[in-house]
Amino acid sequence: MTASTTPGVWQDLAQAIHEEIEAGADGVVVMHGTDTMQFSASAIAFMLETPVPIVFTGSQRSADRPSSDNVMNAVSAVEAAKSDCAEVLICMHASESDDRCALHRGTRARKNHTSRRDAFETIGADPLGEVDYESEDHEITFRRDYQHRGEAELDLDPDLETDVELVKFTPGAGPELLEAVDDAEGIVIEGTGLGHVNTDWIDHIEELVDAGTEIVMTSQCLDGRVCDRVYDTGRDLLDAGVIEGENMLPGTAKVKLMWALANTDSVAERIRRPMAGEITERSVPVE
C-alpha cells in the first residue's frame, strides 16, 4: 500500500531516476500506487531537474478485473515518456471510457475519487495534455506551455527535512492542535477560504515562528489563491510571520516545504517562487 510511502522512498526513487537519465534514458515511467502518487510526483518534481519526461502511472483496478485500467495507462505513459514534455507528469484515465488518458502536472494533480478510473484531476485547470489511446499512433496533444525536452540540465537535490506537519483547521479547533506539532521544523496549515484560522491560533503561531518554525498557509478550497491581506485575521497572520502558499495544493505545499527547509536559507522566498508548476499565474493582474 502506498500509504506506507516515506520521504526516504522518494529520495531513493529520485536517485534511481537520476541514474537512469544519466545513463542515457530518453524518458522514465514510474509505476506507482494511486493513493499517494501525487505526493511522490511532487517530491520528484522538486528534487530533480530533468531534461526528459518523467511519467507516473498506475491503476485503479487490478489486472484480474475486466475493467482494469492498467494496460491502457501503462501504454499511454510510455507514449508520454517519448514526448517533448520534460516535466514530471501523472498519466491516468481521462474519463470512464477507454479512449483517452490525461496528462497532469505532478504538482497540480489530486486524486479526487476513491475508485473511478478517472480519479485524478488537475486542480484549477484542464489537464496539461492527453494521450489519444484510440488513435493509431496514440497521438499526444498539449493544451498549455511546458518545459521542452533538453531545456533543463539534469540535477539532483534530494535532501528533505522530514519534520514537517500538515494541520487542517476546522471550526472549533483550538490551538492545541499546533501544540501537538510545536517541535516541527515546518508546518503547513489548511485554512478556510482565503487562508484563515480562528484568532485564538494567532498568538501561538507567532510564538512558533519566533522560535524558528516555518509556517505556510494554504486553503481547504480546491481552487483559488490564498490572500491574507483582505481581512483583519489574515493581516494578523501575516504580521505573525505566516508565509502565503499562493494556490499550492496543501499536500504539494508540505512536500515543497520539506525540500525548501533542507536546501535553502530563504525558505519564504522559495515557497512563494514557482519551481515546477505548483503555483500558477494569476488570472487577473494584481497591482
Where are the regions that the model predicts?
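Internal gly/pro-rich beta-alpha loop/helix module
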Residues: T57-S135
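Accessory alpha-helical/coil subdomains and C-terminal extensions
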Residues: A102-G186, V284-E287
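C-terminal non-catalytic interaction/assembly regions of soluble proteins
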Residues: L194-E287
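Short acidic, glycine-rich surface-loop motifs adjacent to enzyme active sites
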Residues: E22-M37, D183-L194
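ATP/NTP phosphate-donor binding region
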Residues: M1-E20, D203, S266
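Short Gly/Thr/Asp-enriched flexible loops that form oxyanion-binding sites at enzyme active sites
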Residues: V30-V52, D200-I205
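Short beta-strand segments
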Residues: V30-H32, V55-G58, L89-A94, K168, ...
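A short helix->loop->beta-strand "cap" motif at the edges of active sites that frequently abuts
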Residues: T50-P53, A86, L208-E214
